Each structure stands twice: as structure tokens, then as C-alpha cells.
Regions:
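Short alpha-helical transmembrane segments in multi-pass integral membrane proteins
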Residues: 1-21, 79-144, 188-243, 299-368, ...
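N-terminal transmembrane alpha-helices
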Residues: 8-45, 62-74, 78, 103-110, ...
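Transmembrane helical elements of multi-pass membrane transporters/channels
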Residues: 19-38, 140, 174, 203-207, ...
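Helix-terminus/linker motif at the lipid-water interface of multi-pass membrane proteins
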Residues: 29, 33-52, 121-128, 184-191, ...
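Interfacial/gating helices of multi-pass transporter permease domains
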Residues: 42-62, 128-133, 193-194, 234-241, ...
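Small-residue-rich hydrophobic transmembrane alpha-helices
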Residues: 51-111, 148-167, 273-337, 373-395
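Hydrophobic transmembrane alpha-helices of multi-pass small-molecule transporters
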Residues: 63, 178-182, 207-212, 283-286, ...
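Short runs within selected transmembrane alpha-helices of multi-pass transporters and secretion channels
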Residues: 72, 140-159, 167-175, 196-209, ...
Length: 446
């Protein structure tokens, strides 16, 4: 069991968080690798229009993924608290009911997303010359929603128990499979965006299966029929933790969709430039996500064990580590960002130069303010680990209004490049709310 779980209630907070976060960072690197390979292969083989087609669905994809990750992350909060408190019977029942709720959510999400796909693309003012390719990509990827949900719940259980190594291995497997299949389906068979979508879904299936096998090896979360029996209040408690995170992700996504609507009105070249930078956004954000997962598990376990002082030390250590990491990534982007962006773009020389200029402008703005995003993740996750998912949900509402407001108003004042500042403004508004709320909430446990 010791190889599959990690007790985060003992030992150096900074060391524990770093040991937990680093495998997740490596896993995110591999996840970004196969996302970037999708973009590079499609952009280089199928051209700028195909690249724009992928970009046009970016926020729609993020929204559907956000629903799945939101509910499972909420479930993991209670799982980590029971593990920290050593309540083994409650732990098994919580895991079992998390499986049931995840399955129901996945089925509903699959049906809704398939029905709404075309409507969303039309609503977003997707350019006529790319909407067909965008719809093909969405239809195929949406078929994999149950697979993504399975991966998310199994990975969430593992992370709640302090295991970040297994999700890393799963991401490495998925990245390797995705790269190979991209080359076969897109470059070899010339299937375009459909091939990229098939490669992604297949890779996700292998990562989900690997995490499932790993969870099966952990005795303390072995579930039987009795664990699935109705427990008064349990589903409500799980949904009470998961629903606000789900709503938070959805409202952030809706804000992103509103921004995408504005961007789509600027033409496919602007969409392509925006897309190229958004593919690197995953690289900018990957360590922040990792620290977020680490903080949720760390705070949840220590709250279950009643170790409030350790929570404070862990959050401070995480903030410092997040700042250093964001500074390093920003420097890398300023040094090599243009080279990385150029990998995504091919075609007519005049068009590619315009796309690259748009992409570089956006990337330089985000890299300059990256530390704000990292603080946002740390403090949002700390609140979630404390069992407070309402304030993080409200931070999503703040992100929505700030992002949409800036996207609609600033371009009218300084031109279309003003839309690039919508993301930074949204980060800042949410981060301020979360930091203030954390310090107010932690005093209640002192």
C-alpha cells in the first residue's frame, strides 16, 4: 500500500508538496506534448485553416472537460479528508458513491454536448470556412467523454491518497500513443482534424485503463456491493463539494466562449494566432495545475487530521514555490516563445507572419503576468481543501464578468489587441478574492 499512497500529515510541508507536484508537472508536460503534437501536425500538414478549426473549439472543449474535472476534484476533497482522518469505512463508501455520480455526470454530459455541438459553433460566430472541421473534431472528441470521466475519477482517487506518480505514468503512456497515432492518422492517412481527434480519444482510453488498474491495487479503496448502498446525506455532501467546482469551471468557460465569439469576428488569421498561443497556454499553466492538485490533497489530509498549523505552512510554501516556478517559465517563454509558436504555423508566408505576430503579442502579455495565475491556483485549491468550494465558485463568476467586460470594452479603446488583456484582468480579479478569503477562512480553524 505504501507505494500507492502518501501520508501528507507528517514531514516537511514544502518537501511533501514538491514531491507530490513534480510528478504531476511531468505528467502535464506529456499531456501538453500530445496536445502540441496535435496542433503541430495539424498545422503543418493540414494548414492554417485546420489550425484555426482546432482553436475555434478550444473553450468548448475546456467547458466539457471542466464539468468532469470539477465534480471529480470535489469528490477528492472528501476522500482526502477521510484518508487523513483514517476513517477507512467512510473512505470506501465515499469512493464508491463518487464512481456512481461520475458515471451519471458523464452520460448526461455526453448527450448534452453532442446535441449542442453545432449550435455552440454557430452561436460563437465560427467562420464558415472552418466550422465544418470544428464540428467533426468536436463530435469525435465528445464521444470520449466517458473515457475522460473515468480517467478523472481514478486519478482523483489516487491524488487524494497522495499518489501523483501513477497519473504521471498514465500521461506518459497517453502522450506516446497520441504522438504515434497523430503521425499515422493525420500525416500518414491524411485524415486531418478527424485523425487528431481519434488519436486523442484513443490515448485517453489507455491512460484511464492504467489508472483503473492502479486503483484496484490499493486495498483501502477496494469497494464491494455494500459500499454502493445508499448512505443518508453522502451523495448530497459529495455533490455539494463537486457542484460548485463544476459551476466554477463552466462559468469560466462561458466567459472564454464570449471572448472566442469576439475573436472569431476578427477573421481566421487572428483565430489561428490566438490558437497558437493558447496551445502554449497549457505549458504556462501546467505547473500551476500541479501545485493546485498538491495543495488540495495536502490541505484535505491535514484538515482531516486536525493539523491546522501544517496547513498554513504548506500554503505559504506552495506560494513561494509557485512564484519561483512561474518566474522560470516566463523567462523560458521570452527566450524561446517565438520559436515554439512558429512550430504551429505553416502556409502562405504573408499569412504565417501575421499569425506569428498576433501569437507573440498575446504570449508576451501572458508570460509577463504569469505569477498571478499561479497564486490563483494555490489559494483556490487551499480553500477547496478546507471544504469551501463556494468562494472558488464565486471567483469563477468574477473571472467571467471581468474577462467578458474587458474583452468587449478594451478593443474599442485600443484596438483588437486589447482583447489579450482580458485573461490577465480575469486572473487578477479572481486571485484577489481568493487570497483574502483564504486568510479569513483559515482563522476559523485556529
Amino acid at each position: 500500500m505504501s507505494a500507492q499512497v502518501r501520508d501528507m500529515t507528517k514531514g516537511s510541508p514544502a518537501k511533501l508538496i514538491l514531491l507530490f507536484a513534480v510528478p504531476l508537472m511531468l505528467g502535464n508536460i506529456f499531456q501538453q506534448l500530445y496536445t502540441m503534437v496535435d496542433t503541430i501536425v495539424v498545422g503543418q500538414v493540414a494548414g492554417v485553416q485546420a489550425l484555426a478549426a482546432l482553436g475555434a473549439v478550444e473553450w468548448i472543449m475546456w467547458m466539457t472537460l471542466g464539468v468532469s474535472t470539477g465534480v471529480t476534484q470535489g469528490f477528492s476533497i472528501l476522500i482526502s479528508q477521510h484518508y487523513g482522518a483514517k476513517k477507512w469505512n467512510d473512505l470506501k463508501k465515499t469512493v464508491a458513491h463518487s464512481y456512481l455520480l461520475t458515471a451519471v455526470t458523464a452520460i448526461l454530459l455526453l448527450l448534452i454536448s453532442q446535441l449542442a455541438a453545432r449550435w455552440l459553433l454557430v452561436l460563437l460566430n465560427t467562420p464558415d470556412n472552418i466550422i465544418g472541421m470544428s464540428l467533426i473534431y468536436l463530435r469525435i472528441v465528445f464521444c470520449g467523454i466517458p473515457i475522460v470521466a473515468a480517467y478523472n475519477i481514478f486519478a482523483s482517487v489516487l491524488r487524494a491518497l497522495g499518489n501523483s506518480r501513477t497519473p504521471l505514468i498514465a500521461m506518459i503512456i497517453a502522450a506516446f500513443i497520441n504522438v504515434v497515432l497523430d503521425l499515422v492518422f493525420v500525416a500518414g492517412f491524411n485524415w486531418g482534424v478527424a485523425g487528431a481527434a481519434l488519436a486523442t480519444v484513443t490515448a485517453q482510453a489507455f491512460s484511464a485503463f492504467y489508472c483503473f488498474l492502479s486503483v484496484r491495487k490499493i486495498e483501502i479503496v477496494h469497494t464491494d456491493r455494500d459500499d454502493f448502498a445508499k448512505v443518508p446525506g453522502l451523495n448530497r455532501k459529495l455533490f455539494g463539494l463537486g457542484a460548485p467546482i463544476l459551476f466554477q469551471n463552466v462559468i469560466i468557460s462561458v466567459g472564454g466562449l464570449a471572448v472566442q465569439f469576439v475573436i472569431n469576428g476578427y477573421g481566421f488569421l487572428f483565430v489561428a494566432g490566438f490558437t497558437a498561443t493558447n496551445k502554449l497556454y497549457g505549458v504556462l499553466e501546467m505547473a500551476a495545475i500541479s501545485y493546485g492538485y498538491a495543495v488540495v490533497s495536502y490541505v484535505g489530509q491535514n484538515l482531516g487530521a486536525g493539523e491546522i498549523t501544517r496547513i498554513k505552512k504548506g500554503v505559504h510554501a506552495s506560494s513561494f514555490l509557485a512564484f519561483l516556478t512561474s518566474a522560470f517559465i516566463s523567462i523560458v517563454m521570452f527566450l524561446f516563445g517565438k520559436t515554439l509558436l512558429s512550430m504551429f504555423i505553416s502556409g502562405d508566408t504573408e499569412q504565417t507572419s501575421q499569425v506569428l505576430a498576433i501569437a507573440w503579442h498575446y504570449l508576451s502579455i501572458m508570460a509577463s503576468c504569469l505569477c498571478i495565475l499561479y497564486f490563483l491556483y494555490v489559494y483556490r485549491s487551499a480553500l477547496q481543501g478546507l471544504g469551501n468550494t463556494m468562494i472558488p465558485m464565486l471567483s469563477g463568476v468574477v473571472e467571467f464578468f471581468v474577462r467578458v467586460g474587458v474583452a468587449l470594452l478594451l478593443p474599442k479603446l485600443i484596438g483588437q489587441n486589447g482583447i489579450f488583456y482580458a485573461e490577465i484582468a480575469a486572473w487578477t480579479g479572481a486571485a484577489v478574492l481568493l487570497m483574502i478569503s483564504y486568510y479569513i477562512n483559515i482563522r476559523k480553524f485556529a
